[in-house]
Every structure is written in structure tokens, then in C-alpha cells.
A protein has these predicted regions:
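Alpha-helical segment proximal to the catalytic Tyr-Lys
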Residues: 128, 173-177, 235
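C-terminal helical subdomain
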Residues: 105, 184, 205-237, 244-246, ...
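Substrate-binding pocket helix/loop in short-chain dehydrogenase/reductase
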Residues: 99-100, 107-112, 207
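Active-site loop immediately N-terminal to the catalytic Tyr-X3-Lys motif
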Residues: 101, 149-155, 177, 214, ...
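Active-site helix of classical SDR
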Residues: 123, 160, 168
Length: 268
């Protein structure tokens, strides 16, 4: 069948972006709105939810997506205000250092709830609406490069992100008969407000040494991949994790030597 340029558009489709008040989530929400979607932002910080919703002309809901009751309430409100949801982006997440020998049970649970539990809750609830309405749709989860490589000091976070990747594959198979596609995005270094707040001076240049494309990513580049996965142009893609990382995952430890610029592997 011939390609139709309008297939990239999301006109009048209802999209939910969790954790859409800042960073990658806000970039995706902004991108969806630019391509015609009606966007609902589910965000546990009320002020950023409101600000992001105003920017994209959408609906901002103060929601803790780790809580099933709040997810149910947010979904009911979204459907009532905007209509049935056909796009979901599970973007909410969090990370802190958690060395294996020092991680408490509470710490492990916190990282699980922040990075995996909400993916299960939101995917299940939104998919039920899609199935009941017979509308199909696209579900996209934001995982991380840490989901496919070792992450010393971040075992709990990496395990949760790996769980997102496998859950994506399994959910894709279970939901395929209903016309629901399930995919994931795996960023690496992406310039967000949070990264810029904690990064030392000159970090941008150092980040560039580890990325084959020579620079960190931008939230709008994550949004571009999300728009593609949400749109009709990706109608035969499901169960996949796309690494939007400038080539870092493919590099497998190769990096630009800071003095010569030549690719090197490990210490030199």
C-alpha cells in the first residue's frame, strides 16, 4: 500500500503521557500536541502538571501513577474530558544510587514502584479501555540503556528498566489481537532539567566522548521517536525497544578518546 504523508499525524487522538510535567515526558507531550493529539499529562507534581498542560493546550492531572486508585481516577477523568485514549506513554520514573550490598528492601521497592509498577498499572488500565471500545492504539514505555547493560551502583533501577523491556515484549504479544501495539524507547544521556541540575561544569563535552554521535540527546529527539511509534507510520512495529541514544548501545564500550578523537575500548 502506498505511503500517505498524513500517516504521521495524530490529529484528534487522545494521548496520555505520565510524568509529562518535565524532561523527556514534557518533550513528548509537546511533540504530540504539535502533531495534532489531545494530550493528558498525568504528573504527581501539581504545579508542573498545570504548566505543561497549559503549554500544550491539554489536560493536566495531579496523579501518582504508582497508586492504582489514582490511575483509575485519572483515566476516568481523561476519557470524560477528552475521549477514549488511543496513545499511552509510560514515562514516569526515578533513580538514586543503590549499591547492591547497601540497598534496603524499602529502597528496592521504591525503585520498582517508580520504574516498573506504574508501567503495569497504566498499561493494563488503558489497554482495557482500548479493548472495550475496540479502538486499538499504541502504548510506549520509556526504559533506559541501563535495562540492557550492567549498571554498578544502580542494580535495582537497572532491574526495573530491564523489566520494562521484557514486559513490553510480552504485552505486545497479548495485545496484538486487539490492534494494540506496545513498544519502548531506551534513551541514554539526554539533556533534561534534572540532568543539567546535577551535571558538573563541562559535562556536556565529556558526555560527547561516550556517544558515537558526539553529543547528548535532546528531549525533542525522544519526542520524534515517540511520535513515530504512536503514528500510523509504525503500524507493523510492536514488541520492540528503540535505542534513541546516538549509538551508545551499539558502541558496547567503545568511546571517542578525549585527546585523539579516535575510537578506543576501555582504559588507554
Amino acid at each position: 500500500m502506498p505511503l500517505d504523508p498524513s500517516s504521521i499525524l495524530l490529529t484528534d487522538r487522545v494521548a496520555v503521557v505520565t510524568g509529562g510535567g518535565s524532561g523527556i515526558g514534557r518533550g513528548i507531550a509537546r511533540g504530540f500536541a504539535a502533531f495534532g493529539a489531545k494530550v493528558a499529562i498525568w504528573e504527581r507534581h501539581a504545579d508542573t502538571a498545570a504548566a505543561a498542560a497549559e503549554e500544550v493546550g491539554g489536560l493536566g492531572l495531579h496523579t501518582d501513577v504508582r497508586d492504582a486508585a489514582e490511575v483509575d481516577a485519572a483515566l476516568e477523568w481523561t476519557v470524560a474530558e477528552l475521549g477514549p485514549v488511543s496513545i499511552l506513554v509510560n514515562n514516569a520514573g526515578g533513580v538514586f544510587n543503590s549499591p547492591l550490598l547497601e540497598t534496603s528492601e524499602n529502597g528496592w521497592d521504591a525503585l520498582y514502584r517508580s520504574n516498573l509498577k506504574h508501567v503495569i498499572l497504566c498499561t493494563q488500565r488503558v489497554a482495557r479501555v482500548m479493548v472495550e471500545r475496540g479502538i486499538g492504539g499504541s502504548i510506549i514505555s520509556v526504559t533506559s540503556i541501563e535495562g540492557v547493560r550492567a549498571a554498578p551502583g544502580y542494580a535495582a533501577y537497572a532491574a526495573a528498566k530491564a523489566g520494562v523491556i521484557n514486559y513490553t515484549k510480552t504485552a505486545a504479544l497479548e495485545l496484538a489481537p486487539y490492534g494494540i501495539r506496545v513498544n519502548a524507547l531506551a534513551p541514554d544521556i539526554t539533556l533534561t532539567e534534572g540532568i543539567m541540575e546535577v551535571a558538573p561544569e563541562g559535562a556536556g563535552e565529556r558526555f560527547g566522548f561516550t556517544v558515537p554521535m558526539g553529543r547528548p540527546g535532546h528531549v525533542d529527539e525522544m519526542a520524534g521517536a515517540a511520535i513515530f511509534l504512536a503514528s500510523g507510520l509504525s503500524s507493523y512495529i510492536t514488541g520492540q525497544t528503540i535505542h534513541v541514544d546516538g549509538g551508545t548501545q551499539a558502541a558496547s564500550g567503545w568511546y571517542h578518546h578525549p585527546e585523539t578523537g579516535v575510537y578506543s575500548l576501555g582504559p588507554t
